[in-house]
């Protein structure tokens, strides 16, 4: 038979191409590959390239009907991971034609699809992706971005302050709205629905939206500042999600929220388009991310999920804290914080960035620091995250001994003190505690907060330092 030989052949014969020069239009991926014993690194890397692009386990005669050279993924470089036995970084280049325009869903179905269950691999982790401008330009991206958000809110020169309303489940809509009002009245910019607040028997979504809108307008009238509450529009169907977003728009509130991993990228992109068309900001929560990103040798690093979110669309996204209860190693966290905010990010392996990423004109996303943080953390957070961030204190506001509003006052005073000290040229890292103590002298609310949280630390070694 001419030109076709049935049977199984090594992937590396076709898909391992160390001489390949990557194109500007290729999507590049860096995989951490742990081959099964006896499987050579080149074969494992080639298998990843094949199974996430055009390959299948055997030769098929329909290969002759297309141009493999044009469409196949290529493993173009492999390097051993220093300090790890039998772990390699395999670099794979994918031709742009393999992916549907404007669909994170399709991109992930290929790149992190079936290949993760592949038998020749003991484990596989996607560490980073390089998205070429020729692909990122097919996405709308964030509904508004950092600059437009500041203009909408009329807040400049400092991080924004938020608070998740607790207890996360069980409050009635009226009491929930009351808690929102107190926090906003005290000086916060935003309050937040918890990620698992959708529309449960104790509080249906429409009631919550109404009482929260009332709280926002009352707090705005009293403070003269623009306020917001992240109304969680996440729902069981896309239609229901959009219905909730429409109601939020009708109420005239500035921002809604979505759980982008549990809701899914298709739903998220749908909502992001609606938000841009209707002037709503979109806050993104990353519930379920640790299922995907916490294992060091398998899954996907959060920096990839963060890039995907910037493409799919969101104006805020949770990004760990570096200092609180939820995990985050400083350099790695700052690496993907930059990937969210900046236009152009240089390759820097010490920060986990495997590829130079050029977002061209795609708007940036505000990173949200949230989880176990309180007033004593304020200098570190201001120093680490800078102005373009949202600092979110849940228990750190509502746990104040005098109530929610004084808790909000304490956080706002601490933030303003840190920003002023920084602008005066003081060193927040060294003088942080002193700056907070000085501010306590003219804010009894802050003094009370400092007393409550003076000893609390979450001291665990982070799991993932890579």
From Swiss-Prot:
Keywords: Calvin cycle, Carbon dioxide fixation, Chloroplast, Disulfide bond, Lyase, Magnesium, Metal-binding, Methylation, Monooxygenase, Oxidoreductase, Photorespiration, Photosynthesis, Plastid. InterPro entries: RuBisCO, RuBisCo_large_chain_AS, RuBisCO_lsu_C, RuBisCO_lsu_C_sf, RuBisCO_lsu_fd_N, RuBisCO_lsu_N_sf, RuBisCO_lsuI. PROSITE patterns: RUBISCO_LARGE. Its main location: plastid. Pfam families: RuBisCO_large, RuBisCO_large_N. GO terms for molecular function: magnesium ion binding; monooxygenase activity; ribulose-bisphosphate carboxylase activity. This is Ribulose bisphosphate carboxylase large chain. The keyword Chloroplast applies. Substrate binds at residues 114, 164, 168, 286, 318, 370. Its EC number is 4.1.1.39. Binds 1 Mg(2+) ion per subunit. GO terms for cellular component: chloroplast. It catalyses: 2 (2R)-3-phosphoglycerate + 2 H(+) = D-ribulose 1,5-bisphosphate + CO2 + H2O; D-ribulose 1,5-bisphosphate + O2 = 2-phosphoglycolate + (2R)-3-phosphoglycerate + 2 H(+). The keyword Plastid applies. Mg(2+) binds at residues 192, 194-195. The modification N6,N6,N6-trimethyllysine is found at residue 5.
């Amino acid at each position: 038979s001419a030109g076709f030989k049935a049977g199984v052949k090594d992937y590396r014969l076709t898909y391992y191409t160390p001489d390949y020069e990557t194109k500007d239009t290729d999507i590049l991926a860096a995989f951490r590959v742990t081959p099964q014993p006896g499987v050579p690194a080149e074969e494992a890397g080639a298998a990843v390239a094949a199974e996430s692009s055009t390959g299948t386990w055997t030769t098929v005669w329909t290969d002759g009907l297309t141009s493999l050279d044009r469409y196949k993924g290529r493993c173009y470089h492999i390097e051993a991971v220093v300090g790890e036995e039998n772990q390699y970084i395999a670099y794979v280049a994918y031709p742009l034609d393999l992916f549907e325009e404007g669909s994170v869903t399709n991109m992930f179905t290929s790149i992190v699809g079936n290949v993760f269950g592949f038998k020749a691999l003991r484990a596989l982790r996607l560490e980073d992706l390089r998205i070429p401008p020729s692909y990122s330009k097919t996405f709308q991206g964030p509904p508004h971005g950092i600059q437009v958000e500041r203009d909408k809110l009329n807040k400049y020169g400092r991080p924004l302050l938020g608070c998740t309303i607790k207890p996360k489940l069980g409050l009635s809509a009226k009491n929930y709205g009351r808690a929102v009002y107190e926090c906003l009245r005290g000086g916060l910019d935003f309050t937040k629905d918890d990620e698992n607040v959708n529309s449960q028997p104790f509080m249906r979504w429409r009631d919550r939206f109404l009482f929260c809108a009332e709280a926002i307008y009352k707090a705005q009238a009293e403070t003269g500042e623009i306020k917001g509450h992240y109304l969680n529009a996440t729902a069981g169907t896309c239609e229901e999600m959009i219905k909730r977003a429409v109601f939020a728009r009708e109420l005239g509130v500035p921002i809604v929220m979505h759980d982008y991993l549990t809701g899914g990228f298709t739903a998220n992109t749908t909502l992001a388009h609606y938000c841009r068309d209707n002037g709503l900001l979109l806050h993104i929560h990353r519930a379920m991310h640790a299922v995907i990103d916490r294992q060091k040798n398998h899954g996907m690093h959060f920096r990839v999920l963060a890039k995907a979110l910037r493409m799919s669309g969101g104006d805020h996204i949770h990004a760990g804290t570096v200092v609180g209860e939820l995990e985050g190693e400083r350099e790695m966290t700052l690496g993907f914080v930059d990937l969210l905010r900046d236009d152009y990010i240089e390759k820097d392996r010490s920060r986990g960035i495997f590829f130079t990423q050029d977002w061209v004109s795609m708007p940036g996303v505000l990173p949200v620091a949230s989880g176990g943080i309180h007033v004593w953390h304020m200098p570190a957070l201001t120093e680490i995250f800078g102005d373009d961030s949202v600092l979110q204190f849940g228990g750190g506001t509502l746990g104040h001994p005098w109530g929610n509003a004084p808790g909000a006052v304490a956080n706002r005073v601490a933030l303003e003190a840190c920003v002023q000290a920084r602008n005066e040229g003081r060193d927040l890292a060294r003088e942080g505690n002193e700056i907070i103590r000085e501010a306590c002298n003219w804010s009894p609310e802050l003094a009370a907060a400092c007393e409550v949280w003076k000893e609390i630390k979450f001291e665990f070694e982070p799991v993932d330092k890579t």
